[in-house]
Amino acid sequence: MATIKEIKTQLLSVYTLDDPLLVELSEDPRTGVQRLIKHKQKEINQLRLKEEAFQARFTLERELWSNGIDLVAGIDEVGRGCLAGPVVTASVVLDETFDLIDVNDSKQLSSELREELYAKILTEAVSVGIGVCSNQKIDEVNILNATKLAMREAVGNLNVTPQHLLIDAVNAPIEIPKTVMFKGDSKSISIAAASIVAKVYRDHLMRSYAALYPGYGFDKNVGYGTKQHIEGLKTYGVTPIHRQTFEPVPEFLIK
């Protein structure tokens, strides 16, 4: 009879509820074995639900592909509500072989998982484009128009020409057929991938600014108006990367 430690190792290669090993072990009276079985069954069910959710987020892309539209780009932005730094957008084109089931709305993921997925998306995507609109441009044209400009730039930086765009929330003036939707990063795998790329790219950028402008906590708040950030404004004033039209930044400008 196998030991519980040996059974635990054997279960590592079990991926379905009807696996013969699970059926066989269900007759084992040992409490430790039954505990392992329950844990494995829960793990399999969680993986199945994750896979089903992943496939559901691929629905929009598959519908377009089935109609001969092969190059579909998902677009998302990050940083619209920040007091400092640029707004960053990403455009990501995937194909049917893409299988990173953890890809989801970047806000739902840990920073560690985002970093891991970011590297894999850059490798596995058909193409990735980044668009960056500076804080100066944001002050000049407003955040919505700056976001649209960054989205155009992201699409222009793809190394393929997409036939259709899937965009989260913002109806960017790009002369390509598009579908604009709210909460797109939870409905489209391409938009979700774009949300991860944009988020991680911008986080890296803001961490580099933290070294240039210490005292604001940019490495942690990435430009959002946290208590530490506001205290930094009170103590050190406005930096060259602050958005001067965003409250409360104007309060700290030298008159």
Swiss-Prot record:
GO CC annotation: cytoplasm; ribonuclease H2 complex
Cofactor(s) for this UniProt protein: Mn(2+); Mg(2+)
InterPro entries the UniProt entry points to: RNase_HII, RNase_HII/HIII, RNase_HII/HIII_dom, RNaseH-like_sf, RNaseH_sf
Alphabetical keyword list: Cytoplasm, Endonuclease, Hydrolase, Manganese, Metal-binding, Nuclease
GO molecular function, one term: RNA binding
Lineage top rank: taxon: Bacteria
Positions annotated to bind a divalent metal cation: 76-77, 168
UniProt EC number: 3.1.26.4
Keyword Metal-binding applies: yes
Domain RNase H type-2: start-end pairs: 70-255
Pfam families assigned to the protein according to its UniProt record, in alphabetical order: RNase_HII
GO biological process, one term: mismatch repair
Location in or out of the cell: Cytoplasm
Catalytic activity: Endonucleolytic cleavage to 5'-phosphomonoester
Cofactor remark: Manganese or magnesium. Binds 1 divalent metal ion per monomer in the absence of substrate. May bind a second metal ion after substrate binding.
Family: Belongs to the RNase HII family.
Function: Endonuclease that specifically degrades the RNA of RNA-DNA hybrids.
Identification of the protein by name: Ribonuclease HII
Originating species: Pediococcus pentosaceus (strain ATCC 25745 / CCUG 21536 / LMG 10740 / 183-1w)
